[in-house]
Amino acid sequence: MTQLSVVILAAGKGTRMYSDLPKVLHTVAGKPMVQHVIDTAKQIDAKQIHLIYGHGGELLQQRLSSEPVNWVLQAEQLGTGHAMQQAAPFFADDENILMLYGDAPLITKETLERLIAAKPENGIALLTVELENPTGYGRIIRENGSVVAIVEQKDANAEQLKIREVNTGVMVASGASFKKWLANLNNNNAQGEYYITDVIAMANQDGYKVQAVQASEFMEVEGANNRLQLAALERFYQKTQAEKLLLAGVRLIDQARFDIRGSLTHGKDVEIDVNVIIEGEVKLGNRVRIGAGCVLKNCEIGDDVEIKPYSVIEDAVVGKAAQIGPFSRLRPGANLAEETHVGNFVEIKNAQVGKGSKVNHLTYVGDAEVGSNCNIGAGVITCNYDGANKFKTIIGNNVFVGSDSQLVAPVTIADGATIGAGATVTKDVAENELVISRVPQRHIQGWQRPTKKK
């Protein structure tokens, strides 16, 4: 099987974005456009990915530092053909070279596999798309199924203007062919640039076949040159992902008000209300219900869990039949066992909460272990930080912590203990002990409230 290398053009400045950020680093579904393209290139088993960079190259390399790409500098942006010329020295004669664009993030593995499979032994496979309104695009001229020319709008005659099949710029050819044609490109045109589309005419002159393959959807090959086009790509992507989830059995209350910025694995009878955002890798069990306005990132949610509105869960695990929210925050390292309750304005970070325990109101639990069947009252704080270091709070099983208590770590509260409301606990508590540390209540007879001065 012929090896494949991919060239991704990513040197453009993106002037119409009106941004200091390189164009290809603008995001779709929470991920830079060029990252989408790199990920797709990996899926088709590219031996090598050559990334052409220019404007904002330092930032681009910083953001993609973990990617195994060959960085190729295009110091001057003199057209698509010029960009390919910079990568040509790295091409092996006997490999296939696939040319992609860093600002066209939605191209799919399946489309690229069809394109590569269609490449003639000696020739080019060119990706095209059919448009309802092809105005402004180069028309594909065919003879006997083979592409013989790409005619730009301004050069097309009346018959050619009726053609709806247009060029996307995505193509695949052998390394030897590309090197030959790229060496013969010239910039004798109004823009003074080197156009990759000129290789189509060269291939025909050499007697090579140019095979066109049509993309099934225009948005798959659409690029983003401005914020409006970027927003259109985002909406198309979200619509596509929502439709996949609906067809897989997830109930989305309103598919137009749901965003996924990663991957979602789910069980049966999952229900997701409006304005929910999924980020990173999220796993939902069976019969999970997610209320409006929740954000879930890199988390695992067990069967029969209810997440009430406006809760945020990040890098956390929630056990079966738990109830979360509304307005709860689970931070990285939160691990909730089965049948736990976490209520409104509760924050849990780097803590384990045992089966059946309840943390229902206005509470912070951080760097802690909470046993099973505990009740943590409203306003309880685990004081885990002394300004320099963090310390752990350990709470056993069947512990009751009264409202407005402070547990100053490091501290251990053993099984069955009761902490009276308003206590400040600085020492370990033994099993079944009651701790009270409040000022004795005073009664002042005949007290008169102050009155306002007139």
Curated annotation (Swiss-Prot):
<comment type="similarity">
    <text>In the C-terminal section; belongs to the transferase hexapeptide repeat family.</text>
</comment>
<dbReference type="GO" id="GO:0005737">
    <property type="term" value="C:cytoplasm"/>
</dbReference>
<feature type="binding site">
    <location>
        <position position="138"/>
    </location>
    <ligand>
        <name>UDP-N-acetyl-alpha-D-glucosamine</name>
    </ligand>
</feature>
<comment type="pathway">
    <text>Nucleotide-sugar biosynthesis; UDP-N-acetyl-alpha-D-glucosamine biosynthesis; N-acetyl-alpha-D-glucosamine 1-phosphate from alpha-D-glucosamine 6-phosphate (route II): step 2/2.</text>
</comment>
<feature type="binding site">
    <location>
        <position position="364"/>
    </location>
    <ligand>
        <name>UDP-N-acetyl-alpha-D-glucosamine</name>
    </ligand>
</feature>
<feature type="binding site">
    <location>
        <position position="438"/>
    </location>
    <ligand>
        <name>acetyl-CoA</name>
    </ligand>
</feature>
<feature type="binding site">
    <location>
        <begin position="9"/>
        <end position="12"/>
    </location>
    <ligand>
        <name>UDP-N-acetyl-alpha-D-glucosamine</name>
    </ligand>
</feature>
<comment type="function">
    <text>Catalyzes the last two sequential reactions in the de novo biosynthetic pathway for UDP-N-acetylglucosamine (UDP-GlcNAc). The C-terminal domain catalyzes the transfer of acetyl group from acetyl coenzyme A to glucosamine-1-phosphate (GlcN-1-P) to produce N-acetylglucosamine-1-phosphate (GlcNAc-1-P), which is converted into UDP-GlcNAc by the transfer of uridine 5-monophosphate (from uridine 5-triphosphate), a reaction catalyzed by the N-terminal domain.</text>
</comment>
<dbReference type="GO" id="GO:0016020">
    <property type="term" value="C:membrane"/>
</dbReference>
<feature type="region of interest" description="N-acetyltransferase">
    <location>
        <begin position="249"/>
        <end position="454"/>
    </location>
</feature>
<keyword id="KW-0677">Repeat</keyword>
<dbReference type="Pfam" id="PF12804">
    <property type="entry name" value="NTP_transf_3"/>
</dbReference>
<feature type="binding site">
    <location>
        <position position="225"/>
    </location>
    <ligand>
        <name>UDP-N-acetyl-alpha-D-glucosamine</name>
    </ligand>
</feature>
<dbReference type="GO" id="GO:0019134">
    <property type="term" value="F:glucosamine-1-phosphate N-acetyltransferase activity"/>
</dbReference>
<dbReference type="GO" id="GO:0071555">
    <property type="term" value="P:cell wall organization"/>
</dbReference>
<keyword id="KW-0548">Nucleotidyltransferase</keyword>
<protein>
    <recommendedName>
        <fullName>Bifunctional protein GlmU</fullName>
        <ecNumber>2.7.7.23</ecNumber>
        <ecNumber>2.3.1.157</ecNumber>
    </recommendedName>
</protein>
<dbReference type="InterPro" id="IPR011004">
    <property type="entry name" value="Trimer_LpxA-like_sf"/>
</dbReference>
<comment type="pathway">
    <text>Nucleotide-sugar biosynthesis; UDP-N-acetyl-alpha-D-glucosamine biosynthesis; UDP-N-acetyl-alpha-D-glucosamine from N-acetyl-alpha-D-glucosamine 1-phosphate: step 1/1.</text>
</comment>
<dbReference type="InterPro" id="IPR050065">
    <property type="entry name" value="GlmU-like"/>
</dbReference>
<keyword id="KW-0808">Transferase</keyword>
<feature type="binding site">
    <location>
        <position position="152"/>
    </location>
    <ligand>
        <name>UDP-N-acetyl-alpha-D-glucosamine</name>
    </ligand>
</feature>
<feature type="region of interest" description="Linker">
    <location>
        <begin position="228"/>
        <end position="248"/>
    </location>
</feature>
<keyword id="KW-0573">Peptidoglycan synthesis</keyword>
<keyword id="KW-0460">Magnesium</keyword>
<feature type="binding site">
    <location>
        <position position="225"/>
    </location>
    <ligand>
        <name>Mg(2+)</name>
    </ligand>
</feature>
<feature type="binding site">
    <location>
        <position position="349"/>
    </location>
    <ligand>
        <name>UDP-N-acetyl-alpha-D-glucosamine</name>
    </ligand>
</feature>
<comment type="subunit">
    <text>Homotrimer.</text>
</comment>
<feature type="binding site">
    <location>
        <begin position="384"/>
        <end position="385"/>
    </location>
    <ligand>
        <name>acetyl-CoA</name>
    </ligand>
</feature>
<feature type="binding site">
    <location>
        <position position="23"/>
    </location>
    <ligand>
        <name>UDP-N-acetyl-alpha-D-glucosamine</name>
    </ligand>
</feature>
<dbReference type="Pfam" id="PF00132">
    <property type="entry name" value="Hexapep"/>
</dbReference>
<keyword id="KW-0479">Metal-binding</keyword>
<dbReference type="GO" id="GO:0008360">
    <property type="term" value="P:regulation of cell shape"/>
</dbReference>
<feature type="binding site">
    <location>
        <position position="378"/>
    </location>
    <ligand>
        <name>acetyl-CoA</name>
    </ligand>
</feature>
<feature type="binding site">
    <location>
        <position position="103"/>
    </location>
    <ligand>
        <name>Mg(2+)</name>
    </ligand>
</feature>
<feature type="binding site">
    <location>
        <begin position="101"/>
        <end position="103"/>
    </location>
    <ligand>
        <name>UDP-N-acetyl-alpha-D-glucosamine</name>
    </ligand>
</feature>
<keyword id="KW-0963">Cytoplasm</keyword>
<feature type="binding site">
    <location>
        <position position="74"/>
    </location>
    <ligand>
        <name>UDP-N-acetyl-alpha-D-glucosamine</name>
    </ligand>
</feature>
<dbReference type="GO" id="GO:0009245">
    <property type="term" value="P:lipid A biosynthetic process"/>
</dbReference>
<keyword id="KW-0511">Multifunctional enzyme</keyword>
<dbReference type="InterPro" id="IPR018357">
    <property type="entry name" value="Hexapep_transf_CS"/>
</dbReference>
<dbReference type="GO" id="GO:0000287">
    <property type="term" value="F:magnesium ion binding"/>
</dbReference>
